[in-house]
Curated annotation (Swiss-Prot):
GO terms for biological process: cell migration; regulation of angiogenesis; regulation of Arp2/3 complex-mediated actin nucleation; tRNA stabilization. SUPFAM superfamilies: RNI-like (SSF52047). The LRR domain forms a horseshoe-shaped structure that interacts tightly with target RNases via a large protein interaction surface on its interior side. This is Ribonuclease inhibitor. GO terms for cellular component: angiogenin-PRI complex; cytoplasm; lamellipodium; nucleoplasm; nucleus; plasma membrane. Keywords: Acetylation, Cytoplasm, Leucine-rich repeat, Nucleus, Phosphoprotein, Repeat.
């Protein structure tokens, strides 16, 4: 049973009504409910009385150090069997972290902990790691995004990785580690005891100088399946170093996020070698890089190689034009593995969309999800898309948000969506403006086709 309440300011009467439920439900989520330290004594008592509780989320509540301490006291009850705890954005500081070692020692059932958006600082992180290293702690997933951590925190984190083979997922994005910190962290990641499967390091001050260490990590860790390095200035030099590790047989990476990493068409050459050789790689994001049409052509040529088994490609905001669309057409008609293509925020225009529609009308295309938001599509492009929706047998989701279409374009899409031959399940139309008459038709269509979601 689940109690899931979000974005509701709880009155005293409503709180009194909820307390018995908190004592009974297996999953309790009270996110952004205006909770403060005052409510935490009640929460402590309620969870002490609830041996069935396995998940507790109190995200985005101003609990403060004292309030979080009260909640953690409740969880230390011997009957507590909690497995997942989210205290994201709860105003927990270094001063409140002193209780964490004892809590982590006593909560041997806890597998997942979210502490994002709390200013723990390096001293708070040090206390957290003291508990994580304890043999009684069995935590597998930890999120520490936006926690005011610096390079000083990387040695305690590395020490945890060296002694905790059960540790599987680590989110450290948006902390100021910079080159020195990442170098230290990689020493822990390379340790034979570390069996991490997912690592997220978005916007951590990583540079090309760190990519040799990261290369060694991906080369030595067959367990690592997901690596997120987005919003770090790796550049083409860093990408080249990273790819030398990705190419090794020991690398089993499935998901690689390199958005906004200063990659150009030159860097695509190294990535293309990886795409051609690594059938294990399934998801690649290069969003926010200046690949341009030249880089897109190189990627598409690799996607046509039999060794490439990529399922999801993100090239959003990559300065692609209509000139890249014939290359993507070849991919869509011949590639049998690519299910998702994110091309939003590229000036493809109607001519580019018309070109893509040629491939989408092909009987053997397998694409399921297509993002074309903010691509300068007008009513004319909608006409081609509307025709394709009647013939395509694979596309399930289409995003056309923030384009230049009007009533006529939307009506053409709706006319196709009404037909039994159209199998689309979700159409996203954020920031598209139409008249009340069109709005009425949209809502009527949703009633006629309950399986269809139109998001606007």
């Amino acid at each position: 049973m689940s109690l899931d309440i979000q974005c509701e300011q709880l009155s005293d009467a409503r709180w009194t009504e909820l307390l018995p439920l908190i004592q009974q439900y297996q999953v309790v989520r009270l996110d952004d409910c205006g909770l403060t330290e005052v409510r935490c004594k009640d929460i402590r008592s309620a969870i002490q009385a609830n041996p069935a509780l396995t998940e507790l989320s109190l995200r985005t509540n101003e609990l403060g150090d004292a309030g979080v301490g009260l909640v953690l006291q409740g969880l230390q009850n011997p009957t507590c069997k909690i497995q997942k705890l989210s205290l994201q954005n709860c105003s927990l500081t270094e001063a409140g972290c002193g209780v964490l070692p004892d809590v982590l020692r006593s909560l041997s059932t806890l597998r997942e902990l979210h502490l994002n958006d709390n200013p723990l600082g390096d001293e708070g992180l040090k206390l957290l790691c003291e508990g994580l290293r304890d043999p009684q702690c069995r935590l597998e997933k930890l999120q520490l995004e936006y926690c005011n951590l610096t390079a000083t925190s990387c040695e305690p984190l590395a020490s945890v990785l060296r002694v905790k083979p059960d540790f599987k997922e680590l989110v450290l994005s948006n902390n100021d580690f910079h080159e020195a910190g990442i170098h230290t962290l990689c020493q822990g990641l390379k340790d034979s005891a570390c069996q991490l499967e997912s690592l997220k390091l978005e916007n951590c001050g990583i540079t090309s100088a760190n990519c040799k260490d990261l290369c060694d990590v991906v080369a030595s860790k067959a367990s690592l399946q997901e690596l997120d390095l987005g919003s770090n200035k790796l550049g083409n030099t860093g990408i080249a170093a990273l790819c030398s590790g990705l190419l090794l047989p020991s690398c089993r990476l499935r998901t690689l996020w390199l958005w906004d990493c200063d990659v150009t068409a030159e860097g695509c050459k190294d990535l293309c070698r990886v795409l051609r050789a690594k059938q294990s790689l399934k998801e690649l994001s290069l969003a926010g890089n200046e690949l341009k049409d030249e880089g897109a052509q190189l990627l598409c040529e690799s996607l046509l190689e039999p060794g490439c088994q990529l399922e999801s490609l993100w090239v959003k905001t990559c300065s692609l034009t209509a000139a890249s669309c014939p290359h993507f057409c070849s991919v869509l008609t011949k590639n049998r593995s690519l299910f998702e293509l994110q091309m939003s925020s590229n000036p493809l225009g109607d001519s580019g969309v018309v070109e893509l529609c040629k491939a989408l009308g092909y009987p053997d295309t397998v694409l399921r999800v297509l993002w074309l938001g903010d691509c300068d599509v007008t009513d004319s492009g909608c006409s081609s898309l509307a025709t394709v929706l009647l013939a395509n047998r694979s596309l399930r989701e289409l995003d056309l948000s923030n384009n230049c279409m009007g009533d006529n374009g939307v009506l053409q899409l709706l006319e196709s969506l009404k037909q039994p031959s159209c199998i689309l399940q979700q159409l996203v139309l954020y920031d598209i403006y139409w008249t009340d008459e069109v709005e009425d038709q949209l809502r009527a269509l949703e009633e006629e086709r309950p399986s269809l979601r139109i998001i606007s």
